Amino acid sequence: ESKDPEDSXT
């Protein structure tokens, strides 16, 4: 579970 913006995309 990554809290990175790139992982979430939007």
Curated annotation (Swiss-Prot):
It comes from the Eukaryota. This is Unknown protein 23 from 2D-PAGE. It comes from Bombyx mori.
